Regions:
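Conserved helicase/translocase motor-coupling segment
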Residues: 43-48
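Early extracytoplasmic/lumenal segment of secretory-pathway proteins
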Residues: 40
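Short N-terminal binding/cap micro-motifs at the start of the first secondary-structure element
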Residues: 20-24
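C-terminal accessory helical subdomains adjacent to catalytic cores in phosphodiester-
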Residues: 2-8, 26-37, 51-68, 72-211
Length: 211
């Protein structure tokens, strides 16, 4: 498990893995959002331990006004949300009634489940929605149909494989998610990211996002 970093911002965003953190950093830069510090809690089984460590960091109780947590739904979005709430409850933090609905004060807590509160999947599922109308996606679909027909099997994690195949079609192939977002390859203005925008607005509090 990664250790929490020194708290330097009142608004803390806790994400699952470095790739998700890099994407959110790029997304916030694109939106002009500042004042949010990203923390990486590692894997899903490490969230409870990470939150315990974060809550005893110097400055957490006195400084932190907002706490956002991002987790993949994986196979069950309801179970994923309950798991996050269990981790929050375990350290005495407010537990939201549902994703995207903030609760409490100092810290105000909000949870985002990806791709959404009702669908299995992950960050890459959201990315695929954002680029669904790109002409290259037809090629990606044909590629995996061919792979399945020729080999009799497909990658275990299809969303990750599909987004990597899509990014291989870009002028600068092979970029990781955060770099791909900064390069303009992931359609950051897409409605597919509406939940992400709503989540960041909740994390920002009454001031909201920049105009």
């Amino acid at each position: 498990m990664p250790d929490p970093r020194e708290i330097i911002e009142a608004k803390q965003l806790v994400v699952e893995g470095k790739d998700t953190g890099a994407f959110f950093e790029a997304f916030m830069d694109d939106m002009g959002v500042t004042g949010i510090q990203i923390q990486n809690f590692g894997g899903v089984r490490e969230l409870s331990v990470f939150l315990k460590a974060l809550c005893i960091m110097p400055g957490f109780k006195a400084q932190v006004t907002s706490l956002g947590i991002v987790r993949d739904a994986e196979t069950n979005p309801v179970a994923a949300f309950r798991s996050v709430c269990g981790a929050l409850n375990g350290v005495g933090l407010p537990t939201p009634a549902q994703p995207l609905v903030p609760v409490g004060q100092s810290p105000r807590v909000c949870v985002l489940i990806l791709p959404d509160a009702a669908t299995p999947g992950m960050l890459e599922t959201v990315l695929l929605r954002a680029v669904a109308d790109d002409p290259a996606m037809e090629c990606v679909d044909r590629y995996f149909r061919c792979v399945g027909q020729q080999t009799g099997s497909l990658p275990a994690n299809m969303p990750k494989a599909q987004i990597q195949a899509f990014l291989a079609s870009r002028p600068r192939p092979g970029l990781l998610t955060g770099y791909a977002a900064r390069a303009g390859y992931l359609g950051l203005d897409s409605p597919a990211y509406d939940d992400v925008r709503q989540f960041l607005q909740a994390l920002q509090g009454p001031t909201g996002l920049p105009a």
